């Protein structure tokens, strides 16, 4: 099949079309109908008033209509699979030889770190990411980049009880379908993984996958949050009036929200099998880092007093058991009760706001002696 392009200056050209079609496609400028075969197609512009009726014996594609449809499809795809494209591009960025620090963990790493301020770091954290998939990202990044010298694991005390693959929440399980299984090919302990919803068009002409990858890469700016997605949008609003921000809640509302949030996490302490598996995984990670002369730093992120006082005390004891029994060398920055973080530094009960992220990022950079972008 040959793709014939009826060129219109500054609108539709062979060069423009070539950027969007499959690499093996044959593209030629249209000259006359005699060269057009029965399986060929012709791309035209809706602004071209000189399209003979004989064109429509063949497959005719109106460039503007296809461009609009594909653009809409790609925007929908990236919005639906935002986490997948974020992590895919973060892993790609980790291959850069200037990157020597990998930051990872759950949502605490996403909310708590501003990697735009750390030119030598990449953040592989994601919302609801557990120990297993955090380590998957670490190993992949270190395989792709031998210059990695620091691993920063952002978490809370209950982290070693987490296992995303055993969740009873279908929406959370979809994270494996949409993100981790496509990237790592691993379902972990999940026995029945729900299918990933397919949004992208299929085409034997247009390189849809290449276009969406190019678009998503252009949106990646080292940070999960930006103009379209803010920390405020992702606040865990388990208080009564969802229209309120954390900063607008009164003392009673904050206390109630903190208790509810901690109660959700306290349920995790029944997952002893997950704890034992994560304990072994962390031990292996510490040995891996030590064998490669990589500094492993565990950061317990700050939390509000409303959440801290309600969190199960057993988590802290078990957390330190894991760290103390690891054979490798493990650094610890425990800021769980750090008083320099005020209520204004939080987005909700246990996630940092922009000001809180700036403080935590600076603390980690200072400890690891990482270069920091100076603000204008």
Predicted regions and their residues:
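Membrane-embedded segments
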Residues: 103-104, 108-187
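Secreted/periplasmic serine-hydrolase-like ester/acetyl group-modifying domain
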Residues: 170-284
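Phosphate-bearing ligand-interacting subdomains
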Residues: 30-72
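Short, charged N-terminal beta->alpha structural module
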Residues: 1-29, 71-79, 109-117, 122
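Membrane/wall-proximal cationic-aromatic binding patches
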Residues: 65-119, 123, 133-140
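C-terminal regions of proteins
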Residues: 310-376
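Active-site segments of SGNH/GDSL-like serine hydrolases
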Residues: 285-311
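A short, well-structured beta->alpha microelement
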Residues: 18-37, 86-87, 132-133
